[in-house]
Design a protein with these regions (language model features):
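Short beta-alpha junction loops
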Residues: 36-38, 125-132, 152-153, 387-396
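Output/docking surface of receiver
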Residues: 8, 63-65, 127-132, 136-161
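Terpene synthase/cyclase
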Residues: 118, 155-221, 226
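Conserved PLP-enzyme active-site core in the AAT-like
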Residues: 64-67, 73-76, 112, 136, ...
């Protein structure tokens, strides 16, 4: 994946969501947490009536009577379509032998745990009308609603919850995955590559039958060529492919994002082929990936290398800050006869690209804002090979230590590229 960010420009439009449903039925139950779920009292009968009304509308219910640590239930956020948490008014009375502050802290921790990973899943509290007066604003603002016990029919409340839960699940699939689901479920025959024709080829032999049953029909029907018009084009950046690229650019706070097959190695070569010409001077981390060495050879560029430190065990450390100064880079150019000759032929040209390994296999990363301050306008393109760092933009621990992110100042002149491998560490978050 290639992320690009350049000098200031107009803000991009927000990513539009069509809100259309997906044709496949996915399992996202409504989770109900109520100590009285199976108790023969008013609260128990009310919550069971609501659960039955939801099930009668075709939605699955996952009920629990004892939640223990609410934060453990919060881990269910990736599998649920909504949460309903029952709160009794007596939990806020000292006469019942309970600490109201403990109840609120437990509830607050539950909601914070969910919202830490999922800002959109519907959360409802269920209880008596007077119970809502005990709930502070910081909790209320995170809720989709407070269900007042017996103030409306279970059937009406169920339809409301299902509407919100369905809207949530319909908005989960990003554009390309949504289009792929539609295509695989549409019963379209496959007359192009790959030659297994949607898995039909595997049905002709016993071992093929095993293969088909192991992977499942959906995977094989979705294994299609990039010539499928309904899914858009990787090369032309059209249709659902383009919509997903725009969505990814929004998520990573980039101006543009391009999906690439064959990993970051190919992404690196694409960045170089689009920015570097034969005879251009390039500044390269000596501890670079071999795809950068391939790019140097393929483009005919003239490299000067930034040398990292190395300890007595042979472990490669960071490049000293002194190596990045324009003066140090100029000295390297003058010391390299090929680079010096290239600069003499075109003294008006600055080095075309800087490529830094961010991070190395040993976890060495650099302060990007510091490098931008040093080199913005001194080098045409600042390229960060972030094959092992795609997760950095999503955690404050890495602030300023990755190429592109929210609330980061733009370069004034230089273009910034980040190349990612989503199949390495991105899934780890």
């Amino acid at each position: 994946m290639v992320l690009e960010r350049g000098p200031p420009l107009e803000a991009p439009e927000p990513f539009p969501s069509d809100g259309a449903s997906v044709p496949m039925k996915f399992r996202f139950p409504v989770v109900i947490i109520d100590e009285d779920f199976r108790t023969e009292n008013t609260s128990g009968s009310g919550i069971r009536a609501l659960a039955k009304a939801i099930e009668d509308e075709g939605m699955e219910i996952l009920g629990a009577t004892s939640f223990g640590d609410l934060s453990q239930f919060a881990q269910q956020q990736s599998r649920a379509s909504a949460f309903i948490l029952s709160i009794d008014d007596e939990e806020f009375t000292s006469a019942a032998g309970r600490d109201p502050e403990h109840v609120l802290n437990n509830l607050r921790g539950f909601i914070q745990e969910i919202r830490l990973k999922n800002t959109h899943i519907p959360i409802y509290l269920y209880g008596e009308t007077r119970t809502s007066s005990h709930i502070p604003n910081d909790i209320l603002r995170e809720l989709h609603g407070f269900i007042h016990m017996f103030e409306d029919t279970p059937e009406f409340v169920a339809r409301h919850i299902i509407r919100e839960a369905t809207a949530y699940t319909n908005g989960l699939a990003p554009p390309f995955f949504r289009a792929l689901i539609h295509y695989a479920q549409d019963g379209s025959y496959s007359w192009h590559c790959p030659g297994h024709s949607g898995g039909v080829a595997f049905l002709k032999s016993p071992v093929g039958q095993m293969f088909h049953q192991f992977f499942g029909e959906n995977m094989l029907r979705a294994d299609v060529c990039n010539a499928v018009e309904e899914l858009g084009q990787l090369l032309d950046h059209t249709g659902p492919v383009a919509a997903s690229e725009r969505n990814a650019a929004r998520i990573f706070s980039a101006d543009h994002c391009y999906f690439v097959t064959n990993g970051t190695s190919t992404s690196n070569k694409m960045v170089w082929h689009s920015t570097v010409a034969s005879g251009d001077i390039v500044v390269v981390d000596r501890n670079c990936h071999k795809s950068i060495l391939h790019s140097i050879i393929m483009t005919g560029a003239v490299p000067v290398f930034l040398m990292p430190t190395r300890n007595h065990l042979g472990i490669i450390g960071p490049i000293p800050l002194s190596e990045f100064t324009p003066e140090a880079i100029q000295k390297k150019i003058e010391a390299n006869p090929f680079a010096a000759a290239a600069q003499k032929r075109h003294p008006e040209r600055k080095p075309r690209i800087l490529t830094i390994t961010q991070s190395t296999y040993d976890g060495i990363i650099y302060n990007v804002e510091m490098l931008k301050e040093l080199l913005d306008g001194k080098i045409g393109t600042l390229h960060f090979d972030e094959a092992w760092l795609p997760h950095a933009t999503f955690h404050t621990f890495y602030r300023d230590m990755h190429a592109i992110g929210a609330d980061r100042p733009r370069p004034k002149e230089s273009m910034i590229f980040a190349t990612h491998s989503t199949h390495k560490l991105l899934a780890g978050i």
